[in-house]
Design a protein with these regions (language model features):
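Non-transmembrane, aqueous-exposed alpha-helical and coiled segments at domain scale
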Residues: 8, 12, 16, 28-287
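Short, glycine-/small-residue-rich phosphate/pyrophosphate-handling segment
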Residues: 1-4
Length: 287
């Protein structure tokens, strides 16, 4: 079995030296530029190799064979060699091909590619501060929220247990983004990822917004896009905290939210941050 895998190279050093981006040429007839690694035709052997080379999140992966990667690339018109951006903290070049490789490993389908490319563009934007998020001792994870027609097309979960298990698109998109952050950004746990304890959201953290039952503007519309557009939003999230109130009075719901948010010893209280609230339809309707 031929497993396509990215080279473990110090891309930042190569960029400083003016060298290439560290993507080795594959076989001449492959049409792909990633390094080709020959592996025994056995799923366990592939996963053992990937674990040894720290190319996984610790869970089994789908072997990114040439055929699977080429099929994944069919999900976008963008060229495989196009560099979307450099992913901190290792500043590896996130080519469309590399995004596709990690998407295959995570179990994505080709229709996921536009979402993943947009997510990479978002996390690499300067205002997101991916360097800080990836290298901090804080257990922060990247939360991916999807809006618009693409969320419907992928049948993403925006309802009960939307941040939990059970939905293929939520799970594979979130996992693919994490693999990109680790494999392209080189945020290896205990090396460049310095999280003291981490959190489960660092495996995957992805959902869609329930636009139909949202009494306010959809998130992407609130942030300047059109209602009919597809969009992704990325958030640096520490984790989830449940707020328990059965009140039907708006002021009481807001009081509970404020009391829960205070967290006097938390990072946001001490250094600032943007609270991120997720309301159930029942509470949103009251407010």
């Amino acid at each position: 079995m031929r497993a396509l895998a990215e080279q473990s190279v110090d891309n930042l050093l190569k960029l400083v030296k003016g060298e290439d981006d560290g993507v080795a040429a594959a076989e001449e007839d492959s049409g792909l530029r990633a390094k080709t690694t020959l592996v025994e035709d056995d799923l366990e052997a592939v996963n053992r190799l990937f674990r040894e080379r720290k190319w996984t999140d610790g869970l089994p992966v789908v072997p990114p064979t040439r055929e699977r990667v080429e099929a994944m690339l069919a999900g976008t018109p963008r060229k495989p060699e196009e560099v979307i951006d450099l992913v901190a903290p290792g500043f590896g070049a996130a080519t469309v091909e590399r995004i596709a490789i990690n998407a295959v490993m995570a179990g994505c389908e080709p229709a996921c590619m536009p979402v993943l490319i947009a997510a990479v563009e978002a996390v690499c934007s300067p205002e997101f501060n991916l360097q800080g998020i990836q290298a901090t001792t804080n257990p922060v994870a990247v939360w991916l929220i999807v809006n618009g027609p693409v969320a419907k097309a992928l049948d993403m979960n925006a309802g009960p247990n939307c941040l939990g298990q059970g939905n293929w698109a939520n799970a594979t998109l979130g996992r693919a983004l994490r693999l990109i952050l680790q494999n392209v950004g080189r945020a290896l746990p205990g090396v460049m990822d310095r999280a003291t304890h981490g959190q489960p959201g660092k495996y995957l953290f992805c959902c869609a917004e329930n636009e139909e039952e949202n009494p306010w503007e959809a998130l992407h519309v609130e942030r300047g896009l059109e209602a009919g557009q597809s969009a992704v939003t990325v958030v640096g999230a520490e984790g989830t905290t449940n707020m328990n109130t059965h009140s039907k009075i708006a002021a009481e719901i807001i009081r509970v939210v404020a009391e829960t948010m205070k967290r006097p010893a938390g990072n946001d209280y001490r250094t600032g941050g943007e609270p991120w609230l997720v309301f159930s339809p029942e509470h949103a309707d009251v407010l």
